[in-house]
Amino acid sequence: MQTDEPTGTATSAIRIPPLISLRTTLMVAGLLGNVVAVAAYGLFSRTERYGAVGNPDPGSFIGVAEPVGYFGASLSSALCLGALIYFVMMVWPQADGLIDAQAFRIHLAEERVSIGWLAFALTMVVVQAANDSGVTPAELRTGAALFNAITTSETSRAWIVVTICALLVTLTLRVIIRYSDHFVLLIPAVIGVIATAVTGNAGQGPDHDYATSAVIVFALAIAALSGLKITAALTEVTPSRAVLIVQVVCGVLALAYGAELVYLLSPGAAMIDSDFGRLGLVAGVLVTLVCFSDCWALVMGRPHSDHRTRLTALAMMAVTAATAAMSVQTAPRFLTHRFTAWDVFLGYELPQPPNIVRFFTVWRFDSLIGATAIVLGIGYVAGFVRVRRAGNTWPVGRLVAWLTGCVALVFTSSSGVRTYGSAMFSVHMAEHMTLNMFIPVLLVLGGPVTLALRALSAAGDGQQPGPREWLTWLMHSSVTAFLSHPVTNFILFVGSPYIVYFTPLFDTLVRYHWGHEFMAIHFLLVGYIFYWAIIGIDPGPRRLPYLARIGLLFAVMPFHAFFGIALMTMTSAISAEFYRSVNLPWLASIDADQHIGGAIAWSATELPVIIVIVALMAQWARQDHRVAVREDRHADSTYADDDLNAYNAMLRELSRMRR
């Protein structure tokens, strides 16, 4: 493919097999075998599944359709996500940003898979509503009956989210041919994969905060690994080393977080005595074998043979079937547990009010955000050491800023701040302001992209693009240009709190742990993008003049103050029904607690603004110093040139006079 970037991309070596081939036949046979197995399980376990929890039996059709539909939707979403990841990692755009003919064939395969995902997801909206209501599809023929069944089923509403994501992916793939658009499509693909996972067993009952964070990582790891394996089996492609590393990482994450989920949802003897536990063990064994195979190929530096590629793809297909069968039954832990309001809304108990000591001692580690912060800190240190060993310099102050931000992120997401913030509006607002106003400043001052570009090696001639090339493309892509535009920055940073807290959206988000995770990630990213435009040292598509950056900073601050004042002056509490349901015995008034939250939002902007102004002034002074030094050097060079020209002119004049 002709491009300004490194040549020798994977698309030139990709061979799309004929429609009917040996490997296609084997994959279809494996698919049909898994469908039959899942359908048989749904049929023969129907009485036990519904009887164990006392739910009405919706009939044989729904009893079989639910696990089969879940398997079909899970497999197609995994294949769609895996194909997108493969496309992003193995394909490189041409100079004009378009994809070539070979890559377009992969694009067409993604489009066809997304249509199947959409069909399964749409079907599951009705099937799940009928299953949770205990009625047959015929009883949902009227619009009112179907609407009522969907609104009372949390999982059915999750399938609506999946349907929207699948529709967005399908329609977009239908009209795009640019590489960057495939990168953006990873967002709805990821949301579609985790939407039903967070509303299932992991999102219910005691310790559901632990389980929800774990299932997000687990669902993404299993989907990505399954999709990459099946994509490799169907396209006859030899995965690059980078893809193999991603597969190993996904396998390790799936094993670690899957073990946590089995421990939380099927503890003790239930791990062996229940179908849920046994299916989990089978899936764990298969993932272990696949992960070991990938590790061996990575260490030996040899790609999988065609035979092993097919076997690992079939194994991950069976893992998807096992997890689908687990998802349609109630976890053993909940069958004998008596639920309390704290189990439903928090997942843990808060018998005592918060204080400084409990903020530092009451920990519930967030295995999603907290673990990510630890990985980011370790990765930064590794990059710092590599740059130093190469004989280059990197300011220690940036290292300190980044690590401080990572530590603050772990503390905010996993300490008593998050534990009490899920139940109290005032503490939640302190968490929000820290994630949105303070931590992003520290992370931006660390300059992680610049460090990564110095630490990562560039791909050589004839090699596939690597992480350094992907990062360079991302920082100068149209997506980054749009997000970093001052108008976009202003709207996101100012509008986010008003949209989240002054609309019914907060009523939904505050009830679920996935909602708290969403808010934390959203406010952290919005804050990072905003402060990157003001004090960021990393490369990007545009940079405002320093005076304009100061103007942008002071332009947004009054809106945050107005937001805090609005919270303090409201006559009714936000999400009062939720906070009354939690019913903290030591909280005297939820209205007074919201007033405190508003005061925190009003006053919490001062310290970050001071830090940003100091950093901005320092950057401005250094920039002026560099300009002055450059001008002085140029002036010295100019004077030297003038003297030389005058001397040469004198010599020419003397020569003329002699003649």
Curated annotation (Swiss-Prot):
Pfam family membership, one? Caa3_CtaG
The protein's location, in the record's own words, is: Cell membrane
The portions of this protein that span the membrane are: 24-44, 71-91, 115-135, 157-177, 183-203, 214-234, 242-262, 279-299, 311-331, 365-385, 393-413, 433-453, 490-510, 517-537, 550-570, 596-616
The signal peptide annotation in the UniProt record is none
Q: Which domain of life is it from?
A: Bacteria
Q: How does it sit in the membrane?
A: Multi-pass membrane protein
State the UniProt keywords alphabetically: Cell membrane, Membrane, Transmembrane, Transmembrane helix
Main subcellular location of this protein, as a coarse class: membrane
An example GO CC term for this entry is: plasma membrane
Q: Which family does it belong to?
A: To M.tuberculosis Rv0102.
The protein depicted here goes by the name Uncharacterized protein ML1998
Origin organism of this chain?
Mycobacterium leprae (strain TN)
